[in-house]
Regions:
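Gram-negative bacterial Sec-dependent N-terminal signal peptides
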Residues: 1-22
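Electrostatic cytochrome c docking/interface patches
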Residues: 21-38, 52-55, 105-132
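The feature marks the first
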Residues: 26-77
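Stable alpha-helical elements in mature extracytoplasmic
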Residues: 30, 37, 63, 70, ...
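The canonical Cys-X-X-Cys-His
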Residues: 34, 41-47, 99, 135-144, ...
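Sequence context surrounding c-type heme c attachment/ligation sites in exported
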Residues: 35-39, 64, 68, 129-139, ...
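Axial heme c-ligation environment in periplasmic c-type cytochrome domains
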Residues: 52-58, 74-114, 150-156, 174-208
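Surface-exposed interaction/gating patches
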Residues: 110, 117-159
Length: 209
């Protein structure tokens, strides 16, 4: 009972701490300059920031603080991906800010369809977590609609490719992705979760709008 109560209190505290998405960007960049610099990005992420490959993320509408944080992580090696690292190495801090503000301002991906057989399980995990293993609810950091928390650099998840999201959860669980830093929040959560839960969650957030 004590463990359950502590879990519920922790989730409630995280939920209260989550800030609403702000209309004005928290990053000092130029969307106009970013548009001119985004030509290379379009090869993988699409001209409008919506990727045709489900293993490459949609970045349209993603918060600028999160995008900058990930570009810096690719550049300094704290997040590994040969293709992205080679691109990030060529970017200055201002380049990153400009690109992030540009993509943040684009309309997010159109609502995708979640697997009807997985919606129930995915929604339960997203909104309620998993008490037995003390896995916090995704809603606490990523918000009711999956819009994320720009100030805390928690990404928007709504409309993201299910295949990409599931892969990131697997990578966090294995430790291959460690860009959650010293908090280890995503590695800890993913490490307590199963493959079935990854798939259900990923499908559910793909269908959020």
């Amino acid at each position: 009972m004590k463990n359950t109560l502590a879990y519920v209190c922790a989730v409630a505290g995280m939920t209260l701490a989550t800030l609403q998405v702000q209309a004005e960007s928290l990053v000092d960049g130029s969307a106009e300059a970013g548009k001119n610099k985004a030509i290379t990005c379009a090869a993988c992420h699409g001209a409008e920031g919506v990727s045709a490959n489900p293993l490459w993320p949609n970045i349209a509408g993603q918060s600028a603080p999160y995008l900058v944080a990930q570009l810096k992580a690719f550049k300094d090696g704290s997040r590994e991906n040969p293709l992205m690292t080679s691109q990030a190495m060529m970017l200055s801090d201002q380049d990153m800010a400009d690109l992030a503000v540009y993509f943040e301002g684009l309309p997010g991906p159109a609502q995708a369809v979640a697997d009807a057989d997985l919606i129930g399980k995915g929604e339960a995990l997203y909104r309620g977590g998993e008490v037995t293993n003390e896995v916090a609810a995704c809603i606490a950091c990523h918000g009711p609609s999956g819009a994320g928390n720009p100030a805390a650099k928690y990404p928007a998840l709504k409309g993201q490719h299910a295949a990409y999201t599931a892969k990131q959860l697997r990578d966090y669980a294995s430790g291959e992705r460690a860009s959650d830093g010293k908090t280890r929040i995503m590695r800890d959560i993913a490490g307590k979760s199963s493959e079935d839960e990854f798939v259900a969650l990923a499908s559910y957030v793909q269908g959020l709008k």
